[in-house]
Amino acid sequence: MDIFLVVLVLLTIIAISNIVNRFIPFIPVPLIQVALGILAASFPQGLHFELNTELFFVLFIAPLLFNDGKRTPRAELWNLRAPILLLALGLVFATVIVGGYTIHWMIPAIPLAAAFGLAAILSPTDVVAVSALSGRVKMPKGILRLLEGEGLMNDASGLVAFKFAIAAAVTGAFSLAQAAVSFVFISLGGLLCGVVISFLIIRFRLFLRRLGMQDVTMHMLIQILTPFVIYLAAEEIGVSGILAVVAGGITHAVEQDRLESTMIKLQIVSSSTWNIILFILNGLVFVILGTQIPDVISVIFNDTAISNMKVIGYILVITFTLMLLRFLWVLFFWNGKWFFNKDQNIYKPGLRSTLLISISGVRGAVTLAGSFSIPYFLEDGTPFPERNLILFLAAGVILCTLVIATVVLPILTEKEEEDEERNKKLLTARRKLIKTALQTIKEDMNETNKTASLAVIAEYNEKMKNLRFQQYTSSNRIKKHERKVRAQGVKAEQEALMKMLERGDIPEETANVLQERFNELEILYANPFKVGLSKTRLKRLMYWIFFGEHKKPEMSILNEAGLIRATRVKTAKAAIEYLEKHKTDEHKEVFLSVITFYKQLIFRLEHSHHELKSSAHFENQKLEVKLKAVQAIRNEIQTLFEEREISRDISHELRQYINDVEAAMLEGGE
């Protein structure tokens, strides 16, 4: 019961942190969550529990890094492989050496091996904190990808270095050759293990699908279990579980499109479920981090043998050393024209960008969790030297780097984009959202909801067309092009009609009736000033096709109207085939709009002799289709935000708009 109450309190703190962030958006959510965690643990009856390092890594770090590996663009990571490796490997080992000697020189009470261990656990950067901070400021895309790639790799290298340093401190023995061989084995073994296990899981899912087992809930459960299985298996083998889940995430991303392209429901459910899981896990990581800090601080602050001001000074010196080393490392290797890769297309930051990279090296959960894994006793049974001080220094550096980044990054980064640029991004995002909605509707369309789906598709195509209008200096230009495309469709229909007449598929009378109507449509599209007259004639045509006007026997009227309908269906299909072959990227939306018109026309003609079951039933079907599309749009907004294609304020505006649209739909106004 106590564990359940603790979990409830932690989840409540996460919810409160996001509410607080709405009122003080200039403070990132992770910092608010850490502060609330500290507050919750500061009272005698507050949250007090010992952090289980192994459980923390498997429960939080594994799924978070798996998701980061899955969503980070692989091509961009590959292009930045040289700088990422220099930061994730080279800088980590440089930090261990320089930081270790600096800490030991400054605090002789900490043995050199333990100082190396502290420097090693301070070397990994927190990709979650970086993502949260970058959401508030406009950072160059190259820097963001670099920081994400570094965060995926340096957790493993830092933890491996930490493991060997602490082992040396505990046993008093250290072999550089053995450590190097073990590092290569643990790293490469972790990557290989992640790829192999992911491949086996993917094959297993494909096998289930071939057996007809396409239950979304079952496949979603397999997805959720995947990072835990990979991490635990890798650790059991003795290789890096962290690198294994990163490799597993990347492997799943490679196979994702082929696996789930035909399972649109799984895509929607997967995106929504993972968004919730990641939201909770990210929040728990920082809240738990905050709850551990008061106990760590109180031990040192209550120790009369050490000056409080002195240990605060230690924290500031260590933080400054880490940032300075990071700055010099990036500056020398980048401006040295990259002896690893001299490709001019690789992003090369200037002095300001180098400073951005240095400040963005925020430490976080991995640092604190790793430091808590330091044993209490050495091999000979004596207490581990200055363990509490090491924990305090680690916690202090985490807070210091987080606060510095929060304050300095907005100053260094560019101001918010100009209105014109912002509107352009907003327009682009809205087009992507509409395309997502259209894809969702088409994938989910069946015979039962086909009429309602086509009606909703027409509405979204109209919205897409209206967005397209906004990119032109005059809306007349796009309207004129649409008339040209419609005229091309009519021309294709005429040619198909003549071929059917020549083959003897239809009587001459039917061909004459439709040819006359096609001529009227040509005039309509060629001369917009005759719109009123043409619309009237078109209405008469549709009425005649569906109900008949001539004083002929009833069966004769029905037969003739049925033949005309069937012929028009064939000509409309010919028009669709022509437009599909001749559509251009520049006016793709216009062509799709006309094609959709023809598809709706075909459906109406084929089902004109049937009545809809009821208007209420039809509207309910439309509402169901629209709500599914809205959910897909929400998921796409989150994806665009996570991939840095839109800023936080644009994502907020889009979400608010979608909320208004959904409310209008539920009230029957949309």
UniProtKB/Swiss-Prot annotation:
The chain crosses the membrane at residues 5-27, 46-66, 83-103, 105-125, 156-176, 182-202, 228-248, 276-296, 314-334, 355-375, 389-409. Induction: Constitutively expressed, with higher levels at stationary phase. GO terms for molecular function: potassium:proton antiporter activity; sodium:proton antiporter activity. One of its GO terms (biological process) is regulation of intracellular pH. It is a multi-pass membrane protein. GO terms for cellular component: plasma membrane. Keywords: Cell membrane, Ion transport, Lithium, Membrane, Potassium, Potassium transport, Sodium, Sodium transport, Transmembrane, Transmembrane helix, Transport. It is found in: Cell membrane. Gene3D superfamilies: 6.10.140.1330. Transporter involved in the efflux of sodium, potassium, lithium and rubidium. Belongs to the monovalent cation:proton antiporter 1 (CPA1) transporter (TC 2.A.36) family. Nhak (TC 2.A.36.3.2) subfamily. This is Sodium, potassium, lithium and rubidium/H(+) antiporter.
